[in-house]
From Swiss-Prot:
GO biological process: cysteine biosynthetic process; hydrogen sulfide biosynthetic process; methionine biosynthetic process; sulfate assimilation, phosphoadenylyl sulfate reduction by phosphoadenylyl-sulfate reductase (thioredoxin)
Organism: Candida albicans (strain SC5314 / ATCC MYA-2876)
Family note: Belongs to the sulfate adenylyltransferase family.
Protein name: Sulfate adenylyltransferase
Name of the gene encoding the protein in the UniProt record: MET3
Alphabetical list of InterPro entries matching this protein: ATP-Sase_PUA-like_dom, P-loop_NTPase, PUA-like_sf, Rossmann-like_a/b/a_fold, Sulf_adenylyltr_euk, Sulf_AdTrans/APS_kinase, Sulfurylase_cat_dom, Sulphate_adenylyltransferase
Amino acid sequence: MPIPTPHGGKLRDLVIRDAPLKQQLLQEAKTLPALTLTARQLCDLELILNGGFSPLTGFLNQEDYNSVVNDLRLSSVKNESNGKGLLWPIPITLDVDETTSKKHSVGDRIVLIDLRDETPLAILTIESIYKPDKKLEAEKVFRGDSEHPANKYLLETAGDYYIGGELQGINYPKHYDYVDARKTPTELRQEFEKLGWAQENIVAFQTRNPMHRAHRELTIRAAQDIGDKAHILIHPVVGLTKPGDIDHHTRVKVYKQILTKFPDGLATLSLLPLAMRMGGDREALWHALIRTNYGVDHFIVGRDHAGPGKNSQGVDFYGPYDAQELLAKYDDELNIKIVPFRMVTYLPDEDRYAPIDTIDVKKVRTANISGTELRNKLKTGDEIPSWFSYPEVVKILRETNPPRSKQGFAILIDNSHKLGDYLSFALQSTLNQFSGERRITKLNAHQANDSFIVGELVKAGSGVIVPTTNPTPIVNVVGNGNSLVVNQKNNNNQASGNADGEFNLSNDDLVAVVDEIVNYLKDQGFY
């Protein structure tokens, strides 16, 4: 099957290649009001500029926004086969605060700036400035629950006004990591031609997690189900994913390693700079359209695709097959075929994986390790069996997810009274007597104000003693499991409400508190 036509019929690569025109835009950019992009906006801009979001040529104006929210369609681009607006399920918007919105008018041109290095990336010509109904957007697009990560971002972080308009691209956002693997839609289509895959089927596998043996098995089976000459694109997200996910550096190292475990010529890897919304069925449709633009004709969609877990009622935000059902509804408008994700399980007696729907689990012994179990094994240093993951992959995961005995921690001590200082010295002396490589560092009050620095020290494996009257920001950075909070007794202002370990301190129990903290650290596996 030939490489599919991009969504909307044309790949929209918006970065100006003409040198004189680019120089003209750079000069103009120096005279224009500047808007520094957020991390999410930066991801969105990159995929607008490189064509990953084709047919979009800018951030949505008000008419397109309303149509996408209510009908999953653009109003400005029509589907030639049915005359309806072209499918587009996720609103791609440039949010700003009210003050910024009042500085601009329709017809103005503004330059969009990279937050990391202040590089001018694009010039936007404003078509509309509007205040969206955020509650309606939350309800229609992400089902309304306040605990949905996209709704939390929408209602608590995003600006209250949107600016829509066409873009002229000056530069792509600059990346310094895994540059060869960050292929644009144009580059990936060219690679498929070079590999000789252009007339053959290609199935894309989306992931935001590390890959293990089961993932290799299911992707190979998906390719085999499509046909003898099908190939695999491992296309992980390295933009913004779900809070708490394993960092993309660790994951990319895993993907590169597992790629070597596929038969020669079967699979390739490319990284997608997408800011996920964890939008379930709508997001699955969005992912499929994006893969069409990247030149893929098949896409694996699994149970609860792009779902963020449980809602505020303790129930999954999305049904297990909502994504597959929505994609089936619009099948005749897609240039990509959906491959249902087939769960596989390990058969210990036969030393092989098999689709779970092909075996009788009452008669055949199976084995599996859940994500929670894997995290616990990494935390405790317990063995991760080779049937589950390759030793090379486990080694990578252990390097960035060491067992508790090698992890750092922060002890946050209320320093509103001298007793906090006494405890800091006592703890540093006590903990330094234990064997091991962990350093015990005591910060001063000025250093303690920088929660980022504390977080980096903990990541590096240090035990950090922090004098502070406001532990919450540090707990949020370090994480509950690696934080201890010591309050002055009867001081109600100190409780963070977040840390796993909280201790009270009074004049007569300094030694007792030291013993409590040491025992807690031992119970948690730090010693």
